[in-house]
């Protein structure tokens, strides 16, 4: 009961203080508070990140697969001035059945997203991923709230607009729409108590039948990953209201000495036929 009253009090106080703000001013304030809660400069100056843990895929709300996962992310310098739609990240994703499969020196099945292209790399060579998969990666990245806060703030034409406050999972939240020059919008729920992102939601088109897809993500169990930088250790992804993926992280390390070659194809690697 005390927790509920505290939540109601926070929600009420946020409403009183917000009456003098425009929706744009309130949206900017909420986003600025989120950046500060994520670590401020520790978050904004994050050069790279390595997330390890377990992932569970689901179909019809039932677990359909499990793997151990090591996800490497490195950020590229932002253009000055910022460019709309700039994809400033390279990603290496290694998965396996057991922890030793994702040890760096033993990784023999990885996915690379680098310089606008994607590849599945195995002992046979590098197979370019289909245009649809690469485009889905780009869409997911540009709509990810952590990428937006790290790489897209200040982008020309980016509009941050508050939709007010509400409750989500019995906690008071601030809801903000972030819209770019392509009129693509991400709706983000920020926890009023912690100021951290709790949920995000956006829509995209199915590349096969052009139907509208709702993509939602939930973020929980934030921890300090170094220097005051915060990161969620539980991430759930839903599509059209159904759970499709859950990630349970066991460790997150930032600002490591990751070689650039980790995110590029070896010069002598055989290039296989592209996926359809």
Regions found by a protein language model. Name each.
Residues 119-146:
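Acidic/charged, solvent-exposed loop-and-adjacent secondary-structure segments enriched in E/D, K/R, S/T
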Residues 137-177, 198-201:
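Short, conserved active-site entrance elements at the starts or edges of catalytic domains
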Residues 5-14:
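Bacterial N-terminal signal peptides
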Residues 92-97, 124-125, 202-206, 237-243, ...:
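Short, solvent-exposed aromatic-acidic interface loops
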Residues 14-24:
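Bacterial Sec-dependent signal peptides at the C-terminal "C-region" and cleavage site
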Residues 22-23, 27-126, 159-161:
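N-terminal mature ectodomain segment of secretory-pathway/periplasmic proteins
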């Amino acid at each position: 009961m005390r927790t509920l009253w505290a939540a109601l009090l926070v929600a009420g106080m946020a409403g009183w203080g917000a009456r003098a703000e425009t929706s744009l001013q309130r949206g900017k304030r909420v986003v600025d508070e989120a950046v500060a809660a994520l670590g401020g400069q520790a978050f904004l100056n994050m050069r790279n990140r390595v997330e390890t843990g377990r992932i569970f895929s689901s179909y019809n709300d039932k677990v359909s697969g499990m793997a151990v996962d090591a996800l490497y992310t490195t950020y590229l310098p932002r253009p000055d001035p910022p460019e709309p739609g700039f994809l400033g990240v390279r990603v290496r994703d290694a998965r396996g059945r057991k922890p030793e499969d994702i040890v760096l020196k033993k990784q023999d099945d990885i996915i690379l997203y680098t310089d606008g292209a994607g590849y599945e790399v195995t002992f046979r060579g590098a197979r370019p991923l289909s245009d649809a998969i690469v485009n889905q990666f780009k869409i997911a990245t540009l709509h990810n709230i952590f990428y937006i806060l790290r790489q897209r703030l200040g982008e020309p034409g980016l509009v941050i607009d508050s939709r007010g406050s509400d409750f989500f999972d019995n906690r008071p939240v601030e809801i903000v729409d972030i819209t770019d020059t392509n009129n693509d919008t991400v709706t983000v729920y920020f926890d009023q108590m912690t100021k951290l992102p709790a949920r995000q939601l956006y829509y995209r088109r199915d590349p096969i039948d052009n139907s509208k897809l709702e993509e939602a993500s939930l973020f929980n169990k934030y921890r300090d990953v170094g220097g005051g930088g915060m990161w969620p250790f539980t991430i759930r992804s839903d599509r059209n209201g159904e759970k499709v993926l859950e990630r349970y992280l066991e460790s997150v390390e930032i600002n490591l000495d990751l070689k650039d070659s980790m995110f590029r194809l070896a010069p002598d690697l055989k290039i296989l036929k592209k996926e359809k």
